[in-house]
């Protein structure tokens, strides 16, 4: 329907806020502690300007690239996010949207849909895991991903279980039983469209994480898996090297902000790193990802693929990141708002917005390809870049 279309990611967010129960929407905007980092992720892009060319724009712009061996139509991938139960089709709808727009998807190990179902919707799936449960349990999940056909592995390490969110932590129930439904009903009843979408399926939102269990099993409840994760000692660099060797294929380390950590990741044999602060959901006060990107890209960009996630809201943000050294970006909240606003079509809408913005920025800069972008296309304030580590 025409009135389902939205022009910007900001409008998608507004619609998500209107259509989701309050506690569900809060899970899409939550960030750690004061929210300094999540705010800086977005604001930092506004500090960067462009140095446009007025003559010489090509008739068509090439946005295609590759990430970990996968051809994608533009330098934008779907970032792994947990429990996408804001829509009945969840990760399957997102996978279909990514496939329709020619890009790859990171699938969270805390997803609400099985890896087998998601890969059936889009073969370009990078399976994401946390260091959870020790080597034997992790090896089982890696083998399941391999058997399902995942084309790469993403390991997320930047998590400190921050507490004390100033606006309150998301209220995710342990299970969706009658008691929970009754407790949430005052919120849900004033969001009839959201309620109707799930009502048609005769299934409440799924709060289990099937990819944490064996294939064919329902998997643990979200909070059971979360509790096990909190109780698992964090990995060492030897663990990362072991996991990379166990997988034996394209391997991304997500959550790198420091130059010295980037160098250690290269030594561990990774294929790619993502400069990321977990969308501001990690250690509050960490700089925006885009501030850390130039130093990391300069240090290791000729040895591994460097990506970025955090704060991407428009295509011009993507262009700024690529010009400063990113091969591509991963988006998270932006597509979740699209999913909440209009399901698969809403995610496609978000990807179209980003693609249109990339094309417009390339045209204004006088470039025919994203591969022509350089740092001198960007106006960078003197105190913008943060070099963390050596």
Curated annotation (Swiss-Prot):
Reported cofactor(s): FMN
UniProt keyword annotation of Flavoprotein present: yes
UniProt KW keywords: Flavoprotein, FMN, Oxidoreductase
Organism (species): Mycobacterium ulcerans (strain Agy99)
UniProt name for this protein: Pre-mycofactocin synthase
Lineage of the species this protein comes from: Bacteria, Bacillati, Actinomycetota, Actinomycetes, Mycobacteriales
SUPFAM superfamilies registered for this protein in UniProt: FMN-linked oxidoreductases (SSF51395)
Domain FMN hydroxy acid dehydrogenase: 1-383
Function of the protein: Involved in the biosynthesis of the enzyme cofactor mycofactocin (MFT). Catalyzes the oxidative deamination of AHDP (3-amino-5-[(4-hydroxyphenyl)methyl]-4,4-dimethyl-2-pyrrolidin-2-one), forming an alpha-keto amide moiety on the resulting molecule, which is called pre-mycofactocin (PMFT). This reaction occurs via a 5-[(4-hydroxyphenyl)methyl]-3-imino-4,4-dimethylpyrrolidin-2-one intermediate, which converts to PMFT. The alpha-keto amide moiety is the redox-active center for the redox activity of mycofactocin.
EC number(s) reported in the record: 1.4.3.26
Reaction equation(s) it catalyzes: 3-amino-5-[(4-hydroxyphenyl)methyl]-4,4-dimethyl-2-pyrrolidin-2-one + O2 + H2O = pre-mycofactocin + H2O2 + NH4(+)
Highest taxon of the lineage: Bacteria
GO molecular function: FMN binding; oxidoreductase activity
Active site per the UniProt annotation: 278 (proton acceptor)
PROSITE patterns found in the cross-reference section: FMN_HYDROXY_ACID_DH_2
